[in-house]
Amino acid sequence: MAGVKALVALSFSGAIGLTFLMLGCALEDYGVYWPLFVLVFHALSPIPHFIAKRATYDSDATSSACRELAYFFTTGIVVSAFGFPVILARVAVIKWGACGLVLAGNAVIFLTIQGFFLVFGRGDDFSWEQW
């Protein structure tokens, strides 16, 4: 039952993050949909982890070059997702209020993605190993 509660909490927090992102685009004062391109970064962020998990064996080694490279690529993707709205606001494509809403949405969505891997990445009875 704890896994179901975690799944509901993760879906609720993901919905909140997407709401912030949509508010940054669709409010009447902002009305520009360029910040929606951060959804590409949200979709790309777990891919290096999936590849590293498939390519390496689960050994007790403290570090793996493949896993470290996946962390590096994931960090680059996350930093790009936070930098993209700032650059758009700096060149006056979007307003700074929209940038703030998109950054808040980014924080919530990336924390949701991290929470998913913390909850379902363990390997207990209620884990989704196919993910």
UniProtKB/Swiss-Prot annotation:
UniProt-listed InterPro entries: Vps55/LEPROT (IPR007262)
Record bears the keyword Transmembrane helix: yes
Pfam family for this entry, one: Vps55
Presence of keyword Membrane: yes
A GO CC annotation given for this chain: Golgi membrane
Sequence intervals crossing the membrane: 7-27, 32-52, 69-89, 100-120
This protein's UniProt keywords: Endosome, Golgi apparatus, Membrane, Transmembrane, Transmembrane helix
Record-level Gene Ontology MF annotations: signaling receptor binding
Membrane topology recorded in Swiss-Prot or TrEMBL: Multi-pass membrane protein
Domain of life according to the entry: Eukaryota
GO term, biological process aspect, one: negative regulation of growth hormone receptor signaling pathway
Principal subcellular localisation of the protein: Golgi
Location of the protein in the cell: Golgi apparatus membrane; Endosome membrane
Assembly and oligomerization: Interacts with LEPR. Interacts with RAB13.
Family to which this protein belongs: Belongs to the OB-RGRP/VPS55 family.
Role according to the record: Negatively regulates leptin receptor (LEPR) cell surface expression, and thus decreases response to leptin/LEP. Negatively regulates growth hormone (GH) receptor cell surface expression in liver. May play a role in liver resistance to GH during periods of reduced nutrient availability.
Protein's recorded name: Leptin receptor gene-related protein
Organism field: Sus scrofa
Species lineage: Eukaryota, Metazoa, Chordata, Craniata, Vertebrata
